[in-house]
Amino acid sequence: EHPYTDEKNPEEVFLLPRNKEVAKQLAEESIVLLKNRDAILPLSADARISFAGELGKSNGNLCGNWPCCGLPSDNAPLLETLKQSFHHLSESSADSDIVICCIGQESDKTGENHSFSNIDLPSDQVAMVRELKSRGKKIVALLMNGRPLALGEVEPYCDAILEVWRLGTMASEAIVATLSGESNPSGKLAMTFPYSSGQIPVYYNRRPRSRQGTQGFYE
């Protein structure tokens, strides 16, 4: 038996086509459709689309905070992958009808020792979504995060919301396949998303109460 990989020849094991195909399938099955107003998704290949949000320009945010031996350079850039499928994609919202907005948290803000008492989206992201909507754009939000986030400040302005988590090596390909309709976003949330940070902490083993000092335990 030879249970260990020859460290001198990693290319014989890592990033093989068959492994990347499995990674893409797992990533596609992890994406959750949270909103799809007027069936805006899937997007047509000829749609006039633009791209916004710094989160989507970093391969590190696609990998997540536990990539182990995975390298950000192993990921295809999301913007370039989008351009391959959507021929009229622009980085200027002035030339588009639909804006794909990347919102959420950077990958280094999740994981051990990264607790937050406020899980609202950053104010600059909220301002970006509202400003684009004020220009009459349809908003397709890609939510990149490793924890539940409060979406109450942006949800009314979004026409579609896709929870895309941290999908690993084949993140860009899986996201584009979902946006284009090649893949069906069949994932389910594994946790509750509060409307606002004021709802946390959320307990599952007791009834909520407005009065302090007593707890609403189940009998």
What kind of region is each of these model predictions?
Residues E1:
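Short, surface-exposed polybasic-aromatic patches that bind anionic ligands, especially phosphate groups
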Residues T5-E219:
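C-terminal non-catalytic regions of proteins with extracellular/luminal or membrane-system context
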